[in-house]
Amino acid sequence: MSGNRGGSYISGIVPSFKERRPFHERQKDVEEIRSQQPNKVPVIIERFDGERSLPLMDRCKFLVPEHITVAELMSIVRRRLQLHPQQAFFLLVNERSMVSNSMSMSNLYSQERDPDGFVYMVYTSQPAFG
């Protein structure tokens, strides 16, 4: 159960991308991605740790065109999760902040990227945590 470091989709305990990949490997991944596809933003999207009502996605690493907006990315994630239109869904950057839906991914990347070069986002059904 909780000792299963390989991750369990049944229990919902899945190690984060940062836990699975050391910093230098993540940084190398981004360097390769950006050199091969400079118009794409490398994004990691994972389910918020305490989230239980939204499903897990089949993958967490995405290459997003830099010209699309956060709202367009939310639509893509919503479709991948197969959510109903009325189902609550929020994307938080760096597990803490909501950003403007009209912000482009290139602006988000320049403002919020991690030192390893990825933008980290989590999805949740709750906008704030108390």
UniProtKB/Swiss-Prot annotation:
Gene Ontology biological-process annotations: autophagosome assembly; autophagosome maturation; cellular response to nitrogen starvation; cellular response to toxic substance; defense response to Gram-positive bacterium; mitophagy; plasma membrane repair; positive regulation of autophagosome maturation
Residue ranges of coiled coil: none
Keywords: Autophagy, Cell membrane, Cytoplasm, Cytoplasmic vesicle, Lipoprotein, Membrane
Predominant place of localization: cytoplasm
Annotated membrane topology: Lipid-anchor
Effect of R26A: Does not rescue the degradation defect in the lgg-2 bp556 mutant
Disulphide bridges: none
Lipidation, Phosphatidylethanolamine amidated glycine type: G130
GO molecular function terms listed in the Swiss-Prot or TrEMBL record: microtubule binding; phosphatidylethanolamine binding; ubiquitin protein ligase binding
One matching Pfam family: ATG8
Phenotype of the disrupted gene, per the record: Viable with no visible defects in development or fertility. Embryos contain an increased number of endosomes. Lysosomes have a reduced capacity to interact with autophagosomes in embryos and furthermore, there is defective autophagosome degradation with an accumulation of lgg-1-positive autophagosomes in 500-cell embryos. Double knockout with rab-7 partially rescues the defective lgg-1- and lgg-2-positive autophagosome degradation defect in the individual rab-7 and lgg-2 single mutants.
A cellular-component GO term for this protein: autophagosome membrane
SUBUNIT field: May interact with vps-39. Interacts with lgg-3; the interaction is direct. Interacts with atg-16.1 (via WD domain) and atg-16.2 (via WD 5-6 repeats); the interactions are direct. Interacts with sepa-1 (via the LIR motifs); the interaction is direct. Interacts with sqst-1 (via the LIR motifs); the interaction is direct. Interacts with epg-2 (via the LIR motifs); the interaction is weak. Interacts with atg-7; the interaction is direct. Interacts with atg-3. The interaction with atg-7 and atg-3 may be required for the lipidation of lgg-2.
Biological role stated in the UniProt entry: Ubiquitin-like modifier involved in the formation of autophagosomal vacuoles (autophagosomes). When lipidated mediates tethering between adjacent membranes and stimulates membrane fusion. Less effective at promoting membrane fusion than lgg-1. Acts upstream of the autophagy protein epg-5 in the aggrephagy pathway, which is the macroautophagic degradation of ubiquitinated protein aggregates, and preferentially interacts with autophagy proteins and substrates containing LIR motifs to mediate autophagosome formation and protein aggregate degradation.
Name of the molecule in the record: Protein lgg-2
Species this protein is from: Caenorhabditis elegans
